[in-house]
């Protein structure tokens, strides 16, 4: 991001006067040199009720005042942090942006799966995944912090969000650690 967009530069572990913008030019600075707290501050993220950090970046506002066609957020999980089991009443696409890998658990009726999101060029990862409407989902960071985007359609509304009780898991869920 350029300084003209109103956002401040943020430091990395490359030195006291270095900024991410400067450090990444001309080659990309590895994500491991950036601390999660720096990403949280830079992107203006706030705590999410399901765990993790987020900020809404886009919301369709229809002229008739009804529910928009979509919303988008940044969502960050710190090392060891989870997004607890929850579901929403709309389809949700997860997109990997930076950091380590993310494990996304999805439970819909009798179909259960765990997907790994990460570097798009990695053979064991996908760059994105879609959770169907009303399917239970949970996520966890695998390798340090992870930054993803979540796009919900139709637009996310907290009235359509259900957070499961702590330690709850979907019926017949057989994956350990969830």
Where are these regions (language model features)?
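Short, intrinsically disordered, low-complexity terminal segments
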Residues: 15, 19-22
């Amino acid at each position: 991001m350029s300084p003209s967009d109103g956002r401040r530069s943020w430091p990395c572990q490359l030195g006291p006067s270095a900024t991410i913008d400067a450090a990444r030019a001309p080659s990309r600075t590895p994500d491991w040199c950036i601390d999660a707290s720096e990403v949280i501050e830079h992107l203006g993220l706030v705590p999410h009720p399901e765990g993790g950090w987020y900020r809404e970046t886009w919301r369709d506002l229809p002229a008739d005042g009804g529910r928009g066609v979509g919303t988008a957020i940044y969502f960050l999980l710190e090392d060891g942090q989870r997004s607890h089991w929850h579901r929403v009443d709309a389809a949700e696409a997860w997109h990997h942006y930076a950091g380590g890998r993310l494990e996304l658990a999805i439970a819909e009726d009798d179909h259960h799966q765990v997907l790994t999101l990460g570097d798009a060029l990695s053979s064991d990862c996908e760059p994105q995944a879609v959770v169907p409407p009303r399917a239970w989902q949970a996520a966890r960071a695998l390798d340090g912090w992870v930054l993803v985007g979540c796009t919900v359609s139709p637009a996310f509304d907290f009235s359509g969000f259900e957070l499961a009780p702590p330690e709850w898991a979907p019926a017949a869920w057989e994956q350990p650690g969830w």
